[in-house]
Amino acid sequence: MAMGLLTEVCAVAATPIMLAKGSKAGVYVAYDGLKSSGNYIDNACLTFDGTKWNSENVLQWKDNYTSAAFLAYYPYNENVKNAKALPFTVKTDQSTKEAYVASDFLYGNSWSHPVGGFPKPVLHHGMTNIVVNVKAGDGFSEDELKQGNLGVHVKNVYMQANVNLENGEVNASGSIGSIKAYATNALSFSAIVVPQEIRKVTVVWNNVEYDLGFSKYCERGRLYTLTVTLKKTSGGISVTIGGWEDSGEDFGGTVN
């Protein structure tokens, strides 16, 4: 019996992640718990046609009565060697929507039976979403901020991750770098980051960098909002940082 796959994505976002036609995802099927490799189906490639997912090869149930675990992830990586340590790297320059969306990692699983219809895994976000809102303080107007080539960078962060598809655990790894955030509007910026402790955000205005130091551990699948206020003082421009807002919810949109 052939099997199909339907997915949906959880839930709230600064910029909803919508999968485009032609997007590719990977899927594993395991009958006795997920193994690093050697599962019933290992890393089959599925392509999204705008409505549903299709495979080049027909995916078959082992039989007509045994339930199986379905584990899916996006984007597809043909070189995966270990389903419990799947490598993923976020983009350093997320200033374009294409690069921003490409930095999102989705994963999910479901337990299905041959007579129960299509497996329907819910895809969760493996990365963390950091939103920085910039406010005009004393001596500034919003128009002045907007005209100053405003930008935001998340600095000194791990760019790579290893994801365990069985439980969604994410371990930061690799080199340290800086992420240029995506401007969702003139005064709001969003970056997708590997889950880790964030210690530094830089606001750029009129080609001058203003560094903000702090410490906040950002968990996978959560959106954090940070408000930064620029104000003019007798000594120049000062930058103050407000508290983080943890939505406690997955960020994302709906695949339809």
Cite the ranges covered by each PLM segment.
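Generic secondary-structure microfeatures
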Residues: 134-138, 156, 240
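Generic alpha-helix signal with a bias toward terminal, lower-confidence helices
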Residues: 31, 133-135, 144, 164-166, ...
